[in-house]
Design a protein with these regions (language model features):
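Short linear interaction motifs
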Residues: 5-11, 62-66, 78-80
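Short coil-to-beta transition motif at edge beta-strands of beta-rich domains
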Residues: 71-88
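Contiguous surface segments at macromolecular interaction interfaces
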Residues: 1-46, 107-200
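Short N-terminal edge-element motif at the start of the domain
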Residues: 31-74
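Short gly/pro-enriched beta-turn/loop segments at secondary-structure junctions
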Residues: 22, 77-79, 94
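Short beta-strand-centered aromatic/proline hotspots
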Residues: 94-105
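Short His-Asn-centered micro-motif
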Residues: 30, 85-86, 98
Length: 200
């Protein structure tokens, strides 16, 4: 029987979903505007129309999704929290969504193995995934994550700087940007989040 007690099982994250730990490592990760709501439709922005996101694509409906990256270190690990940051500039960039990392996948056998792993959970169509794989000699890695929560109120880059989550415009995340537990708590408060899914 599924256990809904407030604890995290890092060996089987689905078993204790949707809870995440406040004390886990947390990263802010950028996502381009054109991919944001395609991957995270529950986090649709006020400037977007729901009618543009009604088609039944697997990656939109799945709780388990993937984020393809070539970012340099540091990288998150299983059980870490990731906060998605839609890029767009000083006022338009916003943090919108929390996920929890289920797996970091690096050891793909070949291109087809990469495609098979990503295609139903990524925003990218197969031809784009193939282009990503072939782009450089250094191969991408994939973060498989569980979608957890979207922020009721989205704070932008300016607010993140004012709150000292970011150190300035040049501190905007380009890869996986680690933040402290205190900064995570600041984001939760500023976004007016219901913290019932958060445990210590």
């Amino acid at each position: 029987m599924r256990d809904f007690g407030k604890k995290i099982n890092k060996y089987n994250l689905k078993h204790t979903y949707p809870f995440i730990s406040r004390s886990s490592n947390t990263y802010i990760v950028p996502i381009y505007e054109e991919y944001h709501t395609e991957l995270l439709p529950d986090s649709i922005l006020n400037t977007e129309s729901p009618e543009d996101f009604v088609e039944d694509f697997p990656h939109r409906n799945a709780i388990n999704k993937v984020y393809v990256s070539r970012a340099l270190l540091p990288h998150p690990q299983k059980g870490d929290n990731i906060i998605f940051y839609m890029t767009g500039g000083y006022y338009k960039s916003v943090v919108s969504t929390i996920g929890i990392v289920e797996e970091i996948k690096t050891n793909f056998i070949d291109e087809n193995d990469f495609i098979l792993y990503c295609r139903k959970r990524s925003v990218f169509p197969e031809d784009k995934l193939r282009a990503i794989w072939r782009y450089r000699n250094s191969k991408p890695f994939v973060v498989s994550f569980l979608y957890v929560y979207y922020f009721p109120y989205r704070i932008n880059m300016k607010e993140l700087i004012d709150l000292k989550v970011l150190g300035g415009v040049n501190d905007a995340p380009r890869g996986f940007k680690p933040i402290t537990e205190d900064q995570f708590n600041i984001i939760l408060k500023a976004t007016k989040s219901d913290e019932s899914f958060i445990i210590n």
